[in-house]
UniProtKB/Swiss-Prot annotation:
Biological role: Photosystem II (PSII) is a light-driven water:plastoquinone oxidoreductase that uses light energy to abstract electrons from H(2)O, generating O(2) and a proton gradient subsequently used for ATP formation. It consists of a core antenna complex that captures photons, and an electron transfer chain that converts photonic excitation into a charge separation. The D1/D2 (PsbA/PsbD) reaction center heterodimer binds P680, the primary electron donor of PSII as well as several subsequent electron acceptors. D2 is needed for assembly of a stable PSII complex.
Organism: Secale cereale
InterPro entries: D1/D2, Photo_II_D1/D2_sf, Photo_RC_L/M, Photo_RC_L/M_CS, PSII_PsbD/D2
SUPFAM superfamilies: Bacterial photosystem II reaction centre, L and M subunits
Name this protein carries in UniProt: Photosystem II D2 protein
Classification lineage: Eukaryota, Viridiplantae, Streptophyta, Embryophyta, Tracheophyta
Summary of subunit composition and partner proteins: PSII is composed of 1 copy each of membrane proteins PsbA, PsbB, PsbC, PsbD, PsbE, PsbF, PsbH, PsbI, PsbJ, PsbK, PsbL, PsbM, PsbT, PsbX, PsbY, PsbZ, Psb30/Ycf12, at least 3 peripheral proteins of the oxygen-evolving complex and a large number of cofactors. It forms dimeric complexes.
Length: 353
């Protein structure tokens, strides 16, 4: 006797199956369920940034010109943060601040919250896209896991840090020179370069660059001879079945150079993944600490001795004085509403910095 086993038939026009079939269809640009989050959010974030840098002034929030329309260029244009008085308002277009007036919304800095929030969800959507595609083609999800590093940095710097401070005002504005100014702010007010989490972040990013350069050069150096062409690129054949380069030769080379070398490709590539992602996560954790105003290293004994002994000075004490100068200049400029007035004798003078 034969028993036929099968699925219970579903309705012909099941909405979920119809959407799933369309979203995950094989096409030139994969959409997927993650695309429902990624594409609209990325479109709005980029569109908001291009609109802001082209047309919108920062006169009402920072007293600055920040658009191409006002004479800025690509390096100096920015979408600026809202004023400090607006604290952590989401600045919705229909909210009590703008009351549906688009021009007023732009003047208040509404484009910054618009770009920041849509940008954060776009990055999350991109990570989900990598998860979804990896599952579809039966890959491990390490690409998506690695992308959590940039997401952690973005969220910590643009969202968590200002949430810990008095308002969105203290987040970075979206522009090149604006980010540079934010870096100087971080140094002056938080002594960020002496923060151990920043040190781990720098080690991770620069270490990853070094590993990437070494790995790429080593692979190119140990390509198997598989033709009689005159250049390196003769081996770029998508149908090649055999191994591209000699791990044994590479291992012998670096063993002679350093005395130690990777002998396992899996460990080598995991290490190349681990170094930058860990560095980015450490940086993100450090920025969360700054949101709570946690201090970096303080070498108080050196500061006390430098204050008592005019002949004693270290690079650390010089940097502390430099930070004081940054604070004295930036606080009065960035926060005019606080009416901060410093006597002339405490302000740094020109090249004396």
């Amino acid at each position: 006797m034969t028993i036929a086993l099968g699925r219970i038939p579903k309705e012909e026009n099941d909405l979920f199956d119809t959407m799933d079939d369309w979203l995950r269809r094989d096409r030139f640009v994969f959409v997927g369920w993650s695309g429902l989050l990624l594409f609209p959010c990325a479109y709005f974030a980029l569109g908001g940034w291009f609109t802001g840098t082209t047309f919108v002034t920062s006169w009402y929030t920072h007293g600055l010109a920040s658009s191409y329309l006002e004479g800025c260029n690509f390096l100096t244009a920015a979408v600026s943060t809202p004023a400090n008085s607006l604290a952590h308002s989401l600045l919705l277009l229909w909210g009590p601040e703008a009351q549906g007036d688009f021009t007023r919304w732009c003047q208040l800095g509404g484009l910054w919250t618009f770009v920041a929030l849509h940008g954060a969800f776009a990055l999350i959507g991109f990570m989900l896209r990598q998860f979804e595609l990896a599952r579809s083609v039966q890959l491990r999800p390490y690409n998506a896991i690695s992308f959590s590093g940039p997401i952690a940095v973005f969220v910590s710097v643009f969202l968590i840090y200002p949430l810990g401070q008095s308002g969105w005002f203290f987040a970075p504005s979206f522009g090149v020179a604006a980010i540079f100014r934010f870096i100087l702010f971080f140094q002056g007010f938080h002594n960020w370069t002496l923060n151990p989490f920043h040190m781990m972040g720098v080690a991770g990013v620069l270490g990853a660059a070094l590993l990437c350069a070494i790995h790429g050069a080593t692979v190119e150096n140990t390509l198997f001879e598989d033709g009689d062409g005159a250049n390196t690129f003769r081996a770029f054949n998508p149908t090649q079945a055999e191994e591209t380069y000699s791990m044994v030769t590479a291992n012998r080379f670096w063993s002679q150079i350093f005395g130690v070398a990777f002998s396992n490709k899996r460990w080598l590539h995991f290490f190349m993944l681990f170094v930058p992602v860990t560095g980015l996560w450490m940086s993100a954790i450090g920025v969360v600490g700054l949101a709570l105003n946690l201090r970096a290293y303080d070498f108080v004994s050196q500061e006390i001795r430098a204050a008592e002994d005019p002949e004693f000075e270290t690079f650390y004490t010089k940097n502390i004085l430099l930070n004081e100068g940054i604070r004295a200049w930036m606080a009065a400029q960035d926060q005019p509403h606080e009416n901060l007035i410093f006597p002339e004798e405490v302000l740094p003078r020109g090249n004396a910095l």
